[in-house]
């Protein structure tokens, strides 16, 4: 692995994108995203990146473009392909756009991403494509007690989120982890205390709630800055226990929403009992969500925040931090909640199920990926809902319809029979069936079956074996079912042409000759699967694992093993 070469690639791409000047932070983020193991050598790697960026920035823009075009043309094509992505033209314009936008996707790594959390990721990135600018990935992990980051032997949520975003085609320009920015938050807390815009509260929780509900100030609110700074130092030194001291932001004690009144910016968490997976017990004073977000949105230059309507109160709370510091608050747009019929999108409920997070019955992105949903289908679904403020409910069938659109052209057709019975009939001549792999792409070829003359045995579905019924064996002949005895149906040739079958209304059915046993896994709700064993063409053994297929009169599937397929949808 040549770190300098990878840095050179991303420095060129970043420079070309921004008029000839690459940004060290952006290049570092790209480098770390591609080679996560370099995080342990961040200081050493940054020295390399600094030198590479300086070299790239000294080149003329045309020289940068020429090298990028010759050596990594896909980086240019990726951006062009993104800009051509269907659905972007339907996005409403954002207010107050000055040049590009700086947006962020800020997941809490207490769980992996699911279909609902894909919405802010895709919408923010879509506007990054539309206007240009930056897309920031920020892990908001400052609650090691209640929402502890998920890092176990089985799953590392930080890395799983990165993997899910890459799969979605969402590429971030910068990455931050809030638990590694604690000193920054402490510095700004100290400034607020010095300004008299915050205070350390030693009230008992029940006493504070009473005063808040009565719209009264707590006795510590008017403490002079020097007293608050001394108490703050004691908090940092560990001289208070959990619940004994908090740092509050001064807001409006008469605000109609009690939760806005002097909200908590820092609290004590005993990390000797609940250590943080990244920082252990190094810190005991932790910023709340609203404080860390306010500081980061400003320092990272975020211009627009797109997030769920449930955060509307948080926007109000954060406004006080921006006002105290005299900062401009980002434009915030709230969209409604997305509900998926037939799918649980609650992180707490999904975690409580104790099912492996990438189980194909789950609506997690890893589960959907394992099932066979393509990322383009998720983009289509999210963009079709858009950023309207009202709640939206869509059926899983909508996602399946988008998925079908994308996999239909690449899914070759095969014959498979569930609940099979043997159909026996006599042929007075050789019967030939030419079955194309895809009716719309003749160039993919066909397979040819020759049966007869004489006794012919094929397998059909039991539901098609009805005495007195004429069926059209696909691409072969029209056969009348004479009688059915257990697992064997007996028939006779009725006619040969497709036109004759259409004339008499005979259904066209799939059939299998010289079959192989096929197992189909069918999701049947969260944590539940049905296993079906049927018979399929021998050609199915030649299909590569991971490929999509369509079984005639059955649906779309993805191959998972030598003779095992996962059912997606019809």
UniProtKB/Swiss-Prot annotation:
It is found in: Cytoplasm. Its EC number is 6.1.1.17. It catalyses: tRNA(Glu) + L-glutamate + ATP = L-glutamyl-tRNA(Glu) + AMP + diphosphate. SUPFAM superfamilies: Nucleotidylyl transferase, Ribosomal protein L25-like. Keywords: Aminoacyl-tRNA synthetase, ATP-binding, Cytoplasm, Ligase, Nucleotide-binding, Protein biosynthesis. GO terms for biological process: glutamyl-tRNA aminoacylation. A motif ('HIGH' region) lies at residues 107-117. GO terms for cellular component: cytosol. It comes from the Archaea. InterPro entries: Gln/Glu-tRNA_Ligase, Glu-tRNA-synth_arc/euk, Glu/Gln-tRNA-synth, Glu/Gln-tRNA-synth_Ib_cat-dom, Glu/Gln-tRNA-synth_Ib_codon-bd, Rbsml_bL25/Gln-tRNA_synth_N, Ribosomal_bL25/Gln-tRNA_synth, Rossmann-like_a/b/a_fold. One of its GO terms (molecular function) is ATP binding. It is an enzyme of class 6 (ligase). Belongs to the class-I aminoacyl-tRNA synthetase family. Glutamate--tRNA ligase type 2 subfamily. NCBIfam families: gltX_arch, PRK04156.1. Catalyzes the attachment of glutamate to tRNA(Glu) in a two-step reaction: glutamate is first activated by ATP to form Glu-AMP and then transferred to the acceptor end of tRNA(Glu). This is Glutamate--tRNA ligase. It comes from Pyrobaculum aerophilum (strain ATCC 51768 / DSM 7523 / JCM 9630 / CIP 104966 / NBRC 100827 / IM2). The gene is gltX.
């Amino acid at each position: 692995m040549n770190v300098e070469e990878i840095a050179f690639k991303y420095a060129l791409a970043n420079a070309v994108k921004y008029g000839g000047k690459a940004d060290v932070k952006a290049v570092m983020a790209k480098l770390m995203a591609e080679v996560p193991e370099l995080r342990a050598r961040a200081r050493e790697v940054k020295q390399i990146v600094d030198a590479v960026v300086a070299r790239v920035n000294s080149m003329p823009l045309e020289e940068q473009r020429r090298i990028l075009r010759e050596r990594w043309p896909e980086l240019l094509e990726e951006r062009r392909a993104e800009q051509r992505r269907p659905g972007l033209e339907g996005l409403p314009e954002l207010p107050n756009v000055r040049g590009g936008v700086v947006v962020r996707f800020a997941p809490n790594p207490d769980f992996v991403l699911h279909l609902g959390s894909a919405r802010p990721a895709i919408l923010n990135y879509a506007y990054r494509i539309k206007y240009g600018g930056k897309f920031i990935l920020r892990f908001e992990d400052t609650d090691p007690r209640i929402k502890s980051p998920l890092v176990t032997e089985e799953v590392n949520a930080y890395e799983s989120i990165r993997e899910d975003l890459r799969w979605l085609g969402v590429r971030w320009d910068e990455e931050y982890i809030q638990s590694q920015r604690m000193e920054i938050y402490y510095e700004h807390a100290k400034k607020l205390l010095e300004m008299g815009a915050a205070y350390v509260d030693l009230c008992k929780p029940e006493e504070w709630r009473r005063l808040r509900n009565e719209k009264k100030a707590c006795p510590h609110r008017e403490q002079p800055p020097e007293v608050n700074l001394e108490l703050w130092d004691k908090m940092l030194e560990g001289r208070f226990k959990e619940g004994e001291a908090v740092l509050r932001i001064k807001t409006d004690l008469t605000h109609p929403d009690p939760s806005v009144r002097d909200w908590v910016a820092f609290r004590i968490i005993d990390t000797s009992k609940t250590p943080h997976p990244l920082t252990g017990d190094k810190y005991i004073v932790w910023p709340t969500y609203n404080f860390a977000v306010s500081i980061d949105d400003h320092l990272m230059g975020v211009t627009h925040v797109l997030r769920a309507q449930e955060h509307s109160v948080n926007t109000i709370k954060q406004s006080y931090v921006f006002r105290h510091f005299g900062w401009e608050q980002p434009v915030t747009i709230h969209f409604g909640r997305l509900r998926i019929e037939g799918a649980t999108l609650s992180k707490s409920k999904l975690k409580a199920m104790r099912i492996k997070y990438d189980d194909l019955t789950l609506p997690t992105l890893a589960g959907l990926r394992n099932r066979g949903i393509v990322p383009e289908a998720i983009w289509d679904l999210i963009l079709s809902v858009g950023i309207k403020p009202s709640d939206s409910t869509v059926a899983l069938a909508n996602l399946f319809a988008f998925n079908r659109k994308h996999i239909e052209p690449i899914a070759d057709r095969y014959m498979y029979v569930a609940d099979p019975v043997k159909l026996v009939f006599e042929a007075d001549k050789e019967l030939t069936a030419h079955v194309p792999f895809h009716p719309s792409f003749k160039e993919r070829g066909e397979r040819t079956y020759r049966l007869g003359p004489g006794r012919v045995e094929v397998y059909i579905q039991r539901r098609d074996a009805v005495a007195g019924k004429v069926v059209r064996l696909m691409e072969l002949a029209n056969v009348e079912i004479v009688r059915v005895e257990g697992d064997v149906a007996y028939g006779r040739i009725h006619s040969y042409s497709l036109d004759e079958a259409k004339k008499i209304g005979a259904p066209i059915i799939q059939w299998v000759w010289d079959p192989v046993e096929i197992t189909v896994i069918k999701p049947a709700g969260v944590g539940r699967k049905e296993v079906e064993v049927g018979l399929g063409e021998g050609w199915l053994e030649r299909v590569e694992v991971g490929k999509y297929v369509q079984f005639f009169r059955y649906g779309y599937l993805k191959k998972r093993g030598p003779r095992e397929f996962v059912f997606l949808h019809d």
